[in-house]
Amino acid sequence: MSSVPIDSVQAAQQVVSTKIKDKSWIMPTDPAEFLQQIAYQSQLLACLHWLGEFQILACVPLSGSVPIKDVADLAGVPVSQLAHVIRFMATAGFMKEPRRGEVAHTPQSAAFVTDPSFLDAGIFLAQVSARSARKMAQNSAISTLMGGDGANNGSDFDNGELLKSTSESPRVQREVTAYLHYVVNEVSDTANLLAQLDWRKLGSSSVVEIRADRIYPASLVLTELHSTPRFTVQTFQEDSVEQGTAVTTTATTSSSFISKSSEEPSPKRIKPGITYQKRSLGSPQVVTDATMYVMRLERPHSTSVQRSILDEGQIVSELRAHLGVLKHNSNATLILIGPLLPEAGAIDAKAEMVVRFRDLSLNQLTSEREMEVGELVDIIGDVQDESGCLVVVNKLYSRTSSTVALEVRYELYNYRKG
């Protein structure tokens, strides 16, 4: 039997690779193609895991090619199996066979060698995340039999166990960190979403950004667009600062506000006119004359698998801390902004796919879930006093991410009835 010419093999691989990149292949409407895509992606993950476990990628030089047999001997795997894996992965643009019996890196596969964190993420995806996903039906059935509602699926790793394994194993910690960064992470769209607000009507009013990013608060971006409002950047103070107080610094001395950050702000990040403060979570808001309070809900970047925003109790604590301020200043607005599960069709399909994937992964790994927009609206409405309550008066969605902004005001009960 005559062998297939190598140029024909490469041509076939190019056709498949091009088809994979096409949106109709990624999101097929035909049931058979849908199943084929699932099977193909599953095999890609299995092969990536296999290549990683036997450290085969590191055995291939970053430039030039090497005989597949030499790589197989070095890694201690069968030549035939390695050849089949390489030829399959090549259909996705991951490695290539430039000449029959030789293997070389493509830019995609080379990145997994020059930056091992890509491989760390892939291994965690294959060994932990995908395994938990496959056991979702089984775990839900067990949860139901034990008297649960099946929502908390009895995952293999509850949050405590996963945190423990992460802290005890440097390898697991490295893999979890890479997985969170490359697979389930998305870029925050906070600054762009805030820019959609009508800043001109604020004039020289005061704006407070609560729980600002320590390194790059959104206020720095907003001052570039709108120089008139006076900005105050508040970060949660460290335990060493007395509970219930605020420590204020000016822009010229504000480098001290990054007390536990590994990175100090550069001079370019310091803007005249921005005041930096530290506050305790849930302590009374010390800036009482602001027109707008912007509270960021997302957690700081973490090395553990957990929901993207603060816990309900933490959110309620901050809402109550601002209840009096909003009550006594009818012009004041509180903006809650962060990653939330959107209402169906509210954001771009690709962005919704990412956030829905993150939600399911979180549930399968820890039995937790991301918070939905409707849940947060209900939480806000439950914060009240004898005269009125907090209400959501507007919602802003980012079309390209799960970032949502809710505009909140204090409303008197008799006003609502009227």
Curated annotation (Swiss-Prot):
Disulfide bonds: none annotated. One of its GO terms (cellular component) is nucleus. The keyword Transmembrane helix does not apply. Residues 244-272 are annotated as: Disordered. Residues 245-260 have a biased composition (Low complexity). GO terms for molecular function: DNA binding. It is found in: Nucleus. It comes from the Eukaryota. Coiled coil: none annotated. Keywords: DNA-binding, Nucleus, Transcription, Transcription regulation. Transcription factor that, with ptaR2 and ptaR3, coregulates the expression of the gene cluster that mediates the biosynthesis of pestheic acid, a diphenyl ether which is a biosynthetic precursor of the unique chloropupukeananes. PANTHER family: MONODICTYPHENONE CLUSTER TRANSCRIPTIONAL COACTIVATOR MDPA, PUTATIVE (AFU_ORTHOLOGUE AFUA_4G14580)-RELATED. This is Pestheic acid cluster transcriptional regulator 1. It comes from Pestalotiopsis fici (strain W106-1 / CGMCC3.15140). The lineage of its organism: Eukaryota, Fungi, Dikarya, Ascomycota, Pezizomycotina. The gene is ptaR1.
